[in-house]
């Protein structure tokens, strides 16, 4: 189980990303439309003004049950070992074990 503080921090990052999403998108559009380099630098400074944690690259996908940030399956929202346990216990309908 992940620490509660890490899960809370990730939720805070998600809120910040939603809040500053439009500002980042509009700044990126402005940069691509302006040909002069000096104007691009000014807009680039505006792009750096939002907090670091509002950048979408800082977000992690976390396991729904444990909060684990690694080895997540997007389809289920679970980490690998929890997914395996749930499939073995027949808790995920439609998921089957494979053996070869």
UniProtKB/Swiss-Prot annotation:
Organism: Crucihimalaya wallichii
The keyword Transmembrane helix appears for this protein: no
Superkingdom field: Eukaryota
Sequence similarity: Belongs to the universal ribosomal protein uS14 family.
InterPro entries to which the protein is assigned, alphabetical: Ribosomal_uS14, Ribosomal_uS14_bac/plastid, Ribosomal_uS14_CS
Role, per record: Binds 16S rRNA, required for the assembly of 30S particles.
GO biological process, one term: translation
Keywords from the named record: Chloroplast, Plastid, Ribonucleoprotein, Ribosomal protein, RNA-binding, rRNA-binding
Pfam families: Ribosomal_S14
Disulfide bonds: none
Gene3D superfamilies: 1.10.287.1480
Cell compartment(s), UniProt: Plastid, Chloroplast
Subunit structure: Part of the 30S ribosomal subunit.
GO cellular component: chloroplast; small ribosomal subunit
Main location, first listed in the record: plastid
An MF annotation (GO) of this entry: structural constituent of ribosome
Name by which UniProt lists this protein: Small ribosomal subunit protein uS14c
UniProt cross-references to PROSITE patterns, sorted A to Z: RIBOSOMAL_S14
């Amino acid at each position: 189980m992940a620490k509660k503080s890490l899960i809370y921090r990730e939720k805070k990052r998600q809120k910040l990303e939603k809040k500053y999403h439009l500002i980042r998108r509009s700044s990126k559009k402005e940069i691509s439309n302006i040909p002069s380099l000096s104007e691009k630098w000014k807009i680039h400074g505006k792009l750096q003004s939002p907090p670091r944690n509002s950048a979408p690259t800082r977000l992690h996908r976390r396991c729904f049950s444990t909060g684990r940030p690694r080895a997540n399956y997007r389809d289920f929202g679970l980490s690998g070992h929890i997914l395996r346990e749930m499939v073995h216990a027949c808790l995920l309908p439609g998921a089957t074990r494979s053996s070869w």
